[in-house]
Swiss-Prot record:
PROSITE patterns: TPP_ENZYMES
GO cellular component, one term: acetolactate synthase complex
Pfam family, one: TPP_enzyme_N
InterPro entries xref list: DHS-like_NAD/FAD-binding_dom (IPR029035), THDP-binding (IPR029061), Thiamin_PyroP_enz_cen_dom (IPR012000), Thiamin_PyroP_enz_TPP-bd_dom (IPR012001), TPP-bd_CS (IPR000399), TPP_enz (IPR045229), TPP_enzyme_TPP-bd (IPR011766)
Cofactor binding mode and count: Binds 1 thiamine pyrophosphate per subunit.
Catalyses which reaction(s): 5-guanidino-2-oxopentanoate + H(+) = 4-guanidinobutanal + CO2
Taxonomic source organism: Pseudomonas aeruginosa (strain ATCC 15692 / DSM 22644 / CIP 104116 / JCM 14847 / LMG 12228 / 1C / PRS 101 / PAO1)
Enzyme class: lyase
Protein name stated in the entry: Probable 2-ketoarginine decarboxylase AruI
């Protein structure tokens, strides 16, 4: 059997009564599944992630000729994480196709991660026939209420009961992505609706009219007056400010205000910018410095404890907040002035209202320089080891590369100690904090920005959650993706936490596989450096060759 025939054979799935589904003949009528795919293409979707199944065949009928690339993942959770990475790097919504029931429950962790980190995902799934919903008939993949399963982790979860509802639901999803706090949307489509012919072709009915806007003049004036009067202003910016980098830099310079970021906001200022305080509000030197501010302007950040590693920041002055989500204005930190609107437009409006002459930034720059020195000096032995590795990564990393990270101790240190060179360049599962994110998110990021070299930082524990997606990477990628596997043969953070609480370590010392052999089995180039000099050379080599390079760095070799 030839390769093309083999791929065709693999695409076949089985029906609920175990009758083989044969390839359909060309049809003159347009099904809702076909029309939906065409509609997505007209919204600018160029990539979808998923695994075809018997319940989603009508979606896949629409893919050939649509201009949309389908990426076959090895697990629906991988599809969700890839869509997340794609969205974070490209700025466009990531799209998944998943089947009824187990496809939805498998992708749910990735949906939860995207919800926590305000990442736009569009998850389209099948669901059983309309007549069976809620009846408990024992249909294949049946759930009691599929829509309700994802409702708590989405901006909205909807059930389309007719083909004509689909363009309205897609328009509503893009209204969330464009005009609200971007979060996942899940649309379930019954099998009979997917296969139904459309009465009229709505596949070109794109309704996309972003409307974020700016706060009222009175609120802007009040904020500008407070900023102008502040003696020690400081800024905090998060993922909601990724499109406001120029305005943030101008405001920081005008006010001589140090700029802190959340993990999602890393890279908003260049690493060598004198007022770039980095994502350092999770360590004591950062806490001490922010306490000195008499006014803090927080832009596009929920100021969550997952960014600060403590319940509350020690703010002693007033707080002004800029956010698209009004629920953030009085969460834990009551706002003196609340500015609801688009981050970039709001900051530009503030700049117009502030004195045009920049303040003397020398004292603030000196304070930031001291902060950076204090962070390095405060490293415990493990963090000092991480810093040495991160320094080698920085030396080898191409200028336009991104880094996708997992929940691993090396990345925890990197969250505050690694200087990102640009926005959308450090991907981390901050809020939900799931393991297994780094590799598939890195693959999705590569597909969202194929011209950018990619690096994945993952620990041995998290790697095994989604290691099968190396098969996807080897099949789909022809430009450099380097996977740096930090292998300490342990669930290191949990082991350390147990020891810190005087708990005898249980379940934290797994017997790992031969990672080099595993990587080769998936078609990766494999390197195992014995020291940090070799690590830097291997990183450079990986970025210089096409495809996937797996670098296993054992803890003992990093000293």
């Amino acid at each position: 059997m030839g390769a093309r025939a083999l791929r065709r054979e693999r695409r076949l799935r089985w029906s609920p009564n175990w009758t083989r589904i044969l390839p359909m003949q060309p049809q003159k009528t347009l099904t809702a599944g076909q029309a939906l795919v065409r509609l997505l293409a007209n919204y600018g979707v160029d990539t979808v992630f998923g695994i075809p199944g018997v319940h989603t065949l009508e979606l896949y009928r629409g893919l050939p000729g649509s201009g949309i690339r389908h990426v076959l993942t090895r697990h629906e959770q991988g599809a969700g994480f890839m869509a997340d990475g794609y969205a974070r790097v490209s700025g466009k919504p990531g799209v998944c196709f998943v089947i009824t029931g187990p496809g939805v429950t498998n992708v749910a962790t990735a949906i939860g991660q995207a919800y926590a980190d305000s990442v736009p995902l569009l998850v389209i799934s099948s669901v059983n026939h309309s007549a069976s919903l809620g009846k408990g008939w024992g249909c294949l993949h049946e759930t009691q209420d599929q829509r309700a399963m994802t409702a708590p982790i989405t901006a909205f979860s909807a059930l389309a009961l007719s083909p004509e509802q689909l363009p309205e639901l897609i328009a509503r999803a893009y209204a969330v992505f464009d005009s609200e706090r971007p979060r996942p949307v899940h649309i379930s489509i019954p099998l009979d609706v997917l296969a139904a012919p459309v009465a009229h072709d709505w596949s070109a009915a794109v309704a996309r009219r972003p409307g974020r806007g700016v706060p009222c003049s009175e609120a802007l004036r009040a904020a500008a007056e407070r900023l102008a009067a502040a003696r020690r202003p400081m800024l905090i910016a998060g993922g909601g400010a990724l499109a406001a980098g120029e305005a943030l830099a101008a405001l920081s310079e005008r006010l001589a205000a140090p700029l802190f970021t959340s993990v999602a906001g890393k890279g908003l200022l260049p690493p060598d910018a004198p007022l770039n305080a980095g994502a350092s509000l999770c360590v004591a030197p950062g806490w001490e410095m922010i306490a000195e501010a008499d006014l803090v302007l927080a832009v596009g950040t929920e100021m969550a404890d997952t960014d600060f590693w403590r319940e509350r920041l020690p703010l002693s002055g007033e707080l002004i907040r800029v956010d698209i989500d009004p629920r953030k204005f009085n969460d834990f930190y009551p706002s003196a002035v609340a500015l609801r609107g688009d981050a970039r437009q709001t900051l530009e409006a503030l700049l117009v209202r502030l004195p045009q002459e920049a303040r003397d930034s020398a004292p603030a720059a000196a304070r930031v320089a001291r902060l950076r020195a204090e962070i390095r000096a405060a490293h415990a032995p493990l963090q000092a080891l991480h810093q040495a590795i991160l320094d080698r990564i920085a030396a080898a990393l191409p200028a336009d590369a991104f880094v996708s990270t997992d929940m691993t101790q090396l990345a925890y240190t990197g969250n505050y100690a690694f200087a990102s060179r640009a926005p959308r360049s450090w991907l981390h599962p901050t809020g939900y904090g799931t393991l297994g994110y780094g590799l598939p998110a890195g693959i999705g990021a590569k597909l969202g920005a194929p011209q950018r070299p990619g690096l994945v930082l993952v620990g041995d524990g998290g790697f095994l959650y989604t290691a099968q997606e190396l098969a996807t990477a080897s099949e789909e990628l022809d430009s450099p993706l380097v996977v740096l596997l930090w292998n300490n043969d342990a669930l290191g953070q949990i082991r350390d936490d147990m020891l810190g609480l005087d708990i005898e370590p249980v379940g934290v010392l797994p017997r790992n596989p031969d990672f080099a052999l595993l990587g080769r089995a998936y078609g990766c180039a494999v390197r195992q450096p014995q020291d940090l000099d070799e690590l830097e050379r291997d990183l450079r080599a990986g970025f210089g060759q096409s495809g996937v390079t797996l670098i296993e760095l054992r803890h003992a070799c990093a000293r």
